[in-house]
Amino acid sequence: MAEARTSLSAHCRGPLATGLHPDLDLPGRSLATPAPSCYLLGSEPSSGLGLQPETHLPEGSLKRCCVLGLPPTSPASSSPCASSDVTSIIRSSQTSLVTCVNGLRSPPLTGDLGGPSKRARPGPASTDSHEGSLQLEACRKASFLKQEPADEFSELFGPHQQGLPPPYPLSQLPPGPSLGGLGLGLAGRVVAGRQACRWVDCCAAYEQQEELVRHIEKSHIDQRKGEDFTCFWAGCVRRYKPFNARYKLLIHMRVHSGEKPNKCMFEGCSKAFSRLENLKIHLRSHTGEKPYLCQHPGCQKAFSNSSDRAKHQRTHLDTKPYACQIPGCSKRYTDPSSLRKHVKAHSAKEQQVRKKLHAGPDTEADVLTECLVLQQLHTSTQLAASDGKGGCGLGQELLPGVYPGSITPHNGLASGLLPPAHDVPSRHHPLDATTSSHHHLSPLPMAESTRDGLGPGLLSPIVSPLKGLGPPPLPPSSQSHSPGGQPFPTLPSKPSYPPFQSPPPPPLPSPQGYQGSFHSIQSCFPYGDCYRMAEPAAGGDGLVGETHGFNPLRPNGYHSLSTPLPATGYEALAEASCPTALPQQPSEDVVSSGPEDCGFFPNGAFDHCLGHIPSIYTDT
């Protein structure tokens, strides 16, 4: 009896139940003490109705078994109230619960007379039958555990239950709708490394893959009758579309079982295939055979399989069925691999755009900061140009070589345009630097500067020093040399004087107007008698009062301090007359030639400065 119980339990034990109701706690454990008895639900037409002990029924006529387990503490003579605890009964065994649900939900069977057989009802014949009735009652109360809707299998098996008999024996009768859903959810799971069959009404499991393949062929394919070669594997993509031959169904079942009998024979290659055609294609990769030639005229390309050839031939026919689905893109390709590469390129571009958008606010903030800094510099320059009354602040910043006493500009704008202060005296008279160090300027009239398009603060410090600097005294030698090396004629009307050695006065603060500019310039030249005596002798057109001071009516030299200039810009130099008759020296850097080459400014004296002033105007 123990052997019969063991064989029936191993043959009929179903898979574990999952997804049960949360109110029923089913721990994954079983009782250490085996169930006291095993009762079977009779399903054969020849068997009698009701429950019968397993000793009275032959083993070959049994179809299903229900292993019922009771708690070891429940005595056989317990009262119905004490043994009616549903929770304790359900916790006793998971397998008994699943088999009870399957037995309760199985469709009625056809008896000998064609009528449906009644369900097995326990009778009070013995104590064991009373315990079985309690278990069946508990299974009925737990019938809500798997209330799944009807799936696709219900449509398939519905007509067989109502009218036509199934094409396989009664021992493989398909379950009802709920059982189909339960089998779909539980079948096919590999428990403890076993290969499970996922046929819709089968719960067999095997240790080896070869056993599963043999089971599918013998139990499910060979038992089919007629021309219906349909795959009833749970979750098959064919959705019960039948094959027209048995061998095709056998080959198709290799997809579900994982069988790959076609193995590569080359050494070092362990690939295997379920279809022989795929193995042949693979062997061509070892042999280099390419039997599929391109059928386009003039094309000699060959391929190992027909699918690659078909992709290639689309390039000749200009047929590109694989189109990009991204909005705004009209690219089309002949094969899906090229389309996948194209889609990856799209994703890469999107990532770059996202990075740019992420870094965009930072870049805009940097640009805004730079613009604000430049705007502040521009504003400060304008304020410096209009700060002083005479407007000499900007001139000192732009021309540090002309103004040796000026402060070095902060932004380095004019540092590369003009030479430093110590370079200017080397090219001019030794007293030029001393004279220019005081930088007393004569402002231009507002009308002149406005007519030229420049502000009084910008034009006056640049043009005025060129026409307002005093003449240097003659050296003590009999002849003075020009920068070109040619001697100047001496003046015989006055003896020579010692060189000027008076120290230069300290630099004056920012000018507060031009009052007293005439006396400041006179203090720079204590030997003005030389100039006053030389002027009438050389010029010959002197006026009254020239020998006693500067004539305000004479448009020359310092006369521009109190008299408006007759012309704007550098044209005023052309209208000035030379007090001394000096030979003109040719120079390429001289801005204007003619009578303006006087003794005060020999040729080339301010050529370096004049050459860079127009560039300053254009830059501003």
Swiss-Prot record:
Residues 489-510 have a biased composition (Pro residues). Residues 108-132, 414-515 are annotated as: Disordered. Residues 477-488 have a biased composition (Low complexity). Keywords: Activator, Differentiation, DNA-binding, Metal-binding, Nucleus, Repeat, Repressor, Transcription, Transcription regulation, Zinc, Zinc-finger. It is found in: Nucleus. A zinc finger (C2H2-type) spans 195-220, 229-256, 262-286, 292-316, 322-346. PROSITE patterns: ZINC_FINGER_C2H2_1, ZINC_FINGER_C2H2_2. One of its GO terms (biological process) is negative regulation of transcription by RNA polymerase II. One of its GO terms (cellular component) is nucleus. GO terms for molecular function: DNA-binding transcription activator activity, RNA polymerase II-specific; DNA-binding transcription factor activity, RNA polymerase II-specific; RNA polymerase II cis-regulatory region sequence-specific DNA binding; sequence-specific double-stranded DNA binding; zinc ion binding. The combined transgenic expression of the OSK transcription factors POU5F1/OCT4, SOX2 and KLF4, reprograms differentiated cells into induced pluripotent stem cells/iSPCs. iPSCs exhibit the morphology and properties of embryonic stem/ES cells. The coexpression of GLIS1 can increase the efficiency of OSK-induced pluripotent stem cells/iPSCs production. A motif (Bipartite nuclear localization signal) lies at residues 340-356. Belongs to the GLI C2H2-type zinc-finger protein family. Acts both as a repressor and an activator of transcription. Binds to the consensus sequence 5'-GACCACCCAC-3'. By controlling the expression of genes involved in cell differentiation inhibits the lineage commitment of multipotent cells. Prevents, for instance, the differentiation of multipotent mesenchymal cells into adipocyte and osteoblast. Interacts with KLF4. Interacts with POU5F1 and/or POU5F1B. Interacts with SOX2. This is Zinc finger protein GLIS1. It comes from Homo sapiens (Human).
